[in-house]
Amino acid sequence: MGARASVLTGGKLDAWEKIRLRPGGRKSYKIKHLVWASRELERFALNPDLLETAEGCQQIMRQLQPSLQTGTEEIKSLYNAVATLYCVHQRIEVKDTKEALEEVEKIQKKSQEKIQQAAMDKGNSNQVSQNYPIVQNAQGQMVHQAITPRTLNAWVKVVEEKAFSPEVIPMFSALSEGATPQDLNLMLNTVGGHQAAMQMLKDTINEEAAEWDRMHPQQAGPFPPGQIREPRGSDIAGTTSSLQEQITWMTGNPPIPVGEIYKRWIILGLNKIVRMYSPVSILDIRQGPKEPFRDYVDRFFKCLRAEQASQDVKGWMTDTLLVQNANPDCKTILRALGQGASLEEMMTACQGVGGPSHKARVLAEAMSQASGAAAAIMMQRSNFKGPRRTIKCFNCGKEGHLARNCRAPRKKGCWKCGKEGHQMKDCTERQANFLGKIWPSNKGRPGNFLQNRTEPTAPPAESLGFGEEIAPSPKQEMKEKELYPSLKSLFGSDP
């Protein structure tokens, strides 16, 4: 980042940071905007070192201007940043981006007026830029320099790698700067594959040429001596015009920029091809549950560049769909920012969402909620256990504490029988049951159980008389009385 941020130093950097992004806004340009502009230039196959000088900024603006009408918001933002940087290099005091664009427009108009005035005075021979393919030789004649093989190789490589993705259009605009229709046809003919796309491009060029002929009807009658004819649509496309005629139109007084007109037709056809090669609709671009917000924004704007819509519609898509198609975590954050949030604020707020730290924080919150719910369930379950068992002191007889914690004087003797000399655990006092027997009994079975008795093994003798009973012997009555205890002690005088 250090090399990218070293574009401005000292007083220029202070002047850069004082310029506002919008009129009346609070945000101003920072070093990060220079870093972003350098990365964007690399993405468009332009040299980021051009930002270090005012002349380099002029070259960048000349290459970006043809794409401003059909380009995306990123290209416009890049052009605005370069224009502001140009004012800083030229020591032009501006308050915001709007004033910088106005100053650049004034400078460009003055430069254009100077070029036109010099062309009227000197035949437009000394004011032709050496950067264009049409240059002036030693004899003062306008000659054409063919496109270098390096430029053609770069164009073919972009088409092969990108396959008519949205990046192809600004790349074509940069490589075809100042080219003649013959140069543009040479670039199109070097594309070997994608013949279906090239046929679509030819159809678009033919339609635009027919529209040009309709809007510019041919002049009837012979031309005056020394006057060149007006170009037709096929002349602009380079099919019925020679290279010398194209040079004459482009360097005439007034000039007819047949190269720029043909270039606009080609860019219009490339926009249709890009839309065909990008079948994914902007409505289908959604953020994954674990996808970083920055990657989602990159995919969103890449698909938005291929949309054939006006800037107002694209602005609505950015304000609405970018938030609507985000994942739930980012959507919650973006809705909290409000409607007027900028893209920079959105990316700053959603930074880290989906990463390890965010996952750990979400997991910790989920675990804390789960533990709280479990504790609530345990408390609810404990409410169904009923009242606790009260404890009673054996020393004072009161409830609520144990004998070892009792503050009353120590009770002497056994806590059961009250006698001294032994403890309750060693007390021999036994409690009688409801039958009057000491419990537990030391002999035989308990008294409330049926006692053992001798049962005869043979049936009793049957009486031969009628209605006679055998009287029991006194000995047997005494035995039965001993087997069953008396209940007089329990029931009083009952028989």
Swiss-Prot record:
Residues covered by region (Interaction with Gp41): 7-31
Region (Interaction with membrane phosphatidylinositol 4,5-bisphosphate and RNA): 14-33
InterPro entries: Gag_p24_C, Gag_p6, Lentvrl_matrix_N, Matrix_HIV/RSV_N, Primate_lentivir_Gag_pol-like, Retrov_capsid_C, Retrov_capsid_N, Retrovr_matrix
Sequence motif Nuclear localization signal, residues: 26-32
Modified residues (Asymmetric dimethylarginine): 388, 410
Positions where lipid (N-myristoyl glycine) attaches: 2
Molecular function terms from GO: RNA binding; structural molecule activity; zinc ion binding
GO BP term (any one): viral budding via host ESCRT complex
Interaction with host PPIA/CYPA and NUP153: region residues: 189-227
Annotated motif LYPX(n)L motif, positions: 483-490
Record's keyword annotation contains S-adenosyl-L-methionine: no
Pfam families: Gag_p17 (PF00540), Gag_p24_C (PF19317), Gag_p6 (PF08705), zf-CCHC (PF00098)
Sequence segments annotated as region (Interaction with host CALM1): 8-43
Record carries keyword Zinc-finger: yes
One GO location term (cellular component): virion membrane
Region (Interaction with host AP3D1): 12-19
Motif PTAP/PSAP motif boundaries: 456-459
Site (Cleavage): 132-133, 363-364, 378-379, 433-434, 449-450
Region annotated Interaction with membrane phosphatidylinositol 4,5-bisphosphate, chain positions: 73-77
Comment on protein domains: Late-budding domains (L domains) are short sequence motifs essential for viral particle budding. They recruit proteins of the host ESCRT machinery (Endosomal Sorting Complex Required for Transport) or ESCRT-associated proteins. p6-gag contains two L domains: a PTAP/PSAP motif, which interacts with the UEV domain of TSG101 and a LYPX(n)L motif which interacts with PDCD6IP/AIP1.
Record-given protein name: Gag polyprotein
Species of provenance: Human immunodeficiency virus type 1 group M subtype G (isolate SE6165)
Gene that this sequence comes from: gag
